[in-house]
């Protein structure tokens, strides 16, 4: 499954982005990290799109107290959306 995540930030985008980059090994265990997209929407919002996500593993990672502690000073809220590719009209 492909997932788009809106990340509401407590910190600056730059501080959060460094944390995000440093966590690529953990992310690679739940998705195709080579396809991950990340960007700054505004000063307090980041956007992340991940592909080929193992949803059970993602849920376990986000519920992990270690992950929550790591992100608590950076992230106010993660808002995930599932993505479905559109089939072009014939």
PLM features per residue range, with description:
Residues 2-9, 38-64:
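Short, well-ordered beta-strand segments in beta-rich or mixed alpha/beta enzyme
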Residues 21-36, 51-84:
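An amphipathic, aromatic/His-enriched active-site/gating alpha helix that lines ligand/cofactor pockets
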Residues 85-90:
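Short, low-order "capping/linker" segments at domain edges
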